[in-house]
Curated annotation (Swiss-Prot):
This is ATP phosphoribosyltransferase. One of its GO terms (biological process) is L-histidine biosynthetic process. Pathway: Amino-acid biosynthesis; L-histidine biosynthesis; L-histidine from 5-phospho-alpha-D-ribose 1-diphosphate: step 1/9. Belongs to the ATP phosphoribosyltransferase family. Short subfamily. Keywords: Amino-acid biosynthesis, ATP-binding, Cytoplasm, Glycosyltransferase, Histidine biosynthesis, Nucleotide-binding, Transferase. Catalyzes the condensation of ATP and 5-phosphoribose 1-diphosphate to form N'-(5'-phosphoribosyl)-ATP (PR-ATP). Has a crucial role in the pathway because the rate of histidine biosynthesis seems to be controlled primarily by regulation of HisG enzymatic activity. It comes from Brucella abortus (strain 2308). It is found in: Cytoplasm. GO terms for cellular component: cytoplasm.
């Protein structure tokens, strides 16, 4: 039975993933046609490569329609409810680093922690007659972090369809939850990360579907990739 490994379809994630695989001894033979999203691995007839977007990879792993995939941990945990029951993180690959963070306007000088934010959320309801608005593409991670971890209930998530960091200045939200690598975009938009506002430190990971996790072939591929990372 063949194993399907889903890889990022473009950009630096694709390049770095192919380099990790080659280091582990898996040379991916790319198709001549860029519109062909399947590839093969030299000498590995039972290993099929499928190129998808990083978010699609997380979703297909959750469905169990691919056995292994390389995608960001943030996408896995945002896309899949009860992610640890549906997939397993086999290895952190050391690239694609980014943090999912809680950021508020710099002018909120007295707000530096999630506890401060809890007070602000309650005050917003009293002063403005509405809930604190949070712009984000990460609604699941936001709900878990605010409601379950910090007990903050008085807020409303505003779905972000564009540049999330611009939402407070545009007036469509009061603050944001977003992903950042260097923080420069947040600073450019006069936003600051709360001291305890890092929701997740994410990076590219090798992930297996739980239904495939105990497969000897999947275990062998994952072990070989982990060994390659140590070289």
């Amino acid at each position: 039975m063949s194993v399907t490994l889903a890889l990022p379809s473009k950009g630096r994630l694709k390049e770095k993933t192919l380099a990790v695989l080659e280091k582990a001894g898996y040379k991916v033979v790319l198709p001549d046609d860029d519109r062909n999203y399947r590839a093969r691995v030299e000498g590995e007839d039972d290993l099929d490569i499928l190129f998808l977007s990083a978010s699609e990879i997380a979703r297909e792993l959750g469905y169990g329609s691919v056995d292994l995939g390389v995608t960001g941990e943030d996408l896995v945990r945002e896309t899949l409810a009860h992610a640890d029951e549906r997939v397993a993180i086999e290895a952190q690959l050391g690239f694609g680093h980014a943090d999912v963070v809680v950021a508020v306007p710099e002018v909120w000088r007295d707000v530096t922690t999630m506890a401060d934010l809890d007070d602000v959320a309650a005050d917003f309801r009293q002063r403005h007659g509405r809930r604190l608005r949070i712009a984000t593409k990460y609604w699941r991670l936001t709900q878990q972090f605010f409601s379950q971890k910090h007990g903050i209930q008085v807020y409303r998530i505003v779905e972000s369809l564009g540049a999330t960091e611009g939402a407070p200045a545009a007036g469509s939200a009061d603050m944001i939850v977003d992903i950042t690598s260097t923080g420069s975009t947040l600073r450019a938009n006069r936003l600051k990360v709360l001291e305890d506002g890092i929701i997740l430190r994410s990076q590219a990971c090798l992930v297996s579907a739980r239904r495939s996790h105990t497969s000897r072939r999947v275990e062998e591929i994952a072990a070989r990739i982990r060994a390659g990372l140590e070289i």
